[in-house]
């Protein structure tokens, strides 16, 4: 964070597990470093995993087996414990997995944008070997419904001035 601030580099956080709010101290450190090195404020972005479908149930049901398979493979390679459905549900509820209906994903995304003061968000859509047609549906819903709704939510409840 300090080095990025020192050299005036933009920041994008790859948050793939756990609550995004735990990265707030890093964002603040980056902002302080920009200020200390007399750099102009720069955009801050975030990259996380997600899947958007017509309903929460459809999104969860579709994404779960692909997410599980992807994490099982990574777990075998890295010696991690095997993923569970409870872990999947927890990542959706409080973590950095943006899975659900357009409204659910937009609401969670707007909250994350506010907490971290983000100006950009990169959705790594459809974790695992999700079929092409379902990936295209996620892309369409994200662009047509999620993003406009996020903009509405942000406009309705502006942040506290910390956005980069």
Give the residues covered by each predicted segment.
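Alpha-helix-loop-beta-strand connector modules within alpha/beta enzyme cores
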Residues: 140-154
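Short glycine/threonine-rich loop-to-helix capping motif typified by GTGT followed
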Residues: 55-58, 131-141
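Glycine-rich, proline-tolerant flexible connector loops at the mouths of alpha/beta enzymes
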Residues: 15-18, 124-135
């Amino acid at each position: 964070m300090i080095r990025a601030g020192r050299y005036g580099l933009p920041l994008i956080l790859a948050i793939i597990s756990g609550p995004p709010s735990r990265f707030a101290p890093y964002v603040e450190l980056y902002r302080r470093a920009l200020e200390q090195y007399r750099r102009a404020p720069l955009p801050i972005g975030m990259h996380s995993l997600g899947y958007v479908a017509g309903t929460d149930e459809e999104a969860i049901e579709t994404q779960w087996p692909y997410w599980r398979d992807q994490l099982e493979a990574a777990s075998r390679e890295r010696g991690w414990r095997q993923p569970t459905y409870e872990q999947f549900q927890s990542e959706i509820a409080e973590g950095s997995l943006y899975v659900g209906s357009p409204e659910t994903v937009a609401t969670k995304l707007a909250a994350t944008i506010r907490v971290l003061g983000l100006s950009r968000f990169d959705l790594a859509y459809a974790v695992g070997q999700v079929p092409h047609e379902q990936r295209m549906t996620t892309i369409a819903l994200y662009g047509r419904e999620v993003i406009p709704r996020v903009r509405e939510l942000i406009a309705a409840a502006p942040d506290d001035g910390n956005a980069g």
